[in-house]
Amino acid sequence: MTLNIRIIAPDRTVWDAEAQEIILPSSTGQLGILTGHAPLLTALDIGVMRVRVDKEWMPIVLLGGFAEIENNQLTILVNGAEEASQIDLVEAEKNLDTATQLLNDASSSKEKIEATQNIRKARARVQAATAASA
């Protein structure tokens, strides 16, 4: 059996295919989903989702959202998503360095919050690109 997975971002459908297993970055930690999973609605955090198709794992960066599983149908609504194969690792590492420097230079609470979010996004991109190139 397989899971039918649909990942929808505001601007496009990111993924619409079947897979054997999913690992989601939920707001309470990593969440593994296999066929026959109990119905569930969960909030997603910024992080790397891993999709297993046959014996290959594919990382996808998620920028927060929600996931619903019911009857082997997994619907994921996200604020944004990026497939690891489209991420340039060198650029992602530069973005992480820049975001870290912005956090160090931040003086207001708002700047610190924005910089922290940018670091989380950049870190997820680096993790996904590294996993894809391994």
Swiss-Prot record:
Domain of life the protein comes from: Eukaryota
Major subcellular location class: plastid
GO cellular component: chloroplast thylakoid membrane; proton-transporting ATP synthase complex
Keyword set, alphabetical order: ATP synthesis, CF(1), Chloroplast, Hydrogen ion transport, Ion transport, Membrane, Plastid, Thylakoid, Transport
Membrane topology annotation: Peripheral membrane protein
Subcellular location per the Swiss-Prot or TrEMBL entry: Plastid, Chloroplast thylakoid membrane
InterPro entries from the UniProt entry: ATP_synth_F1_dsu/esu, ATP_synth_F1_dsu/esu_N, ATP_synth_F1_esu_C, ATPsynth_dsu/esu_N
Disulphide bond pairs: none
Residues forming coiled coils: none
GO molecular function, one term: proton-transporting ATP synthase activity, rotational mechanism
Function: Produces ATP from ADP in the presence of a proton gradient across the membrane.
Subunit structure: F-type ATPases have 2 components, CF(1) - the catalytic core - and CF(0) - the membrane proton channel. CF(1) has five subunits: alpha(3), beta(3), gamma(1), delta(1), epsilon(1). CF(0) has three main subunits: a, b and c.
Family per record: Belongs to the ATPase epsilon chain family.
Protein name: ATP synthase epsilon chain, chloroplastic
Protein encoded by which gene: atpE
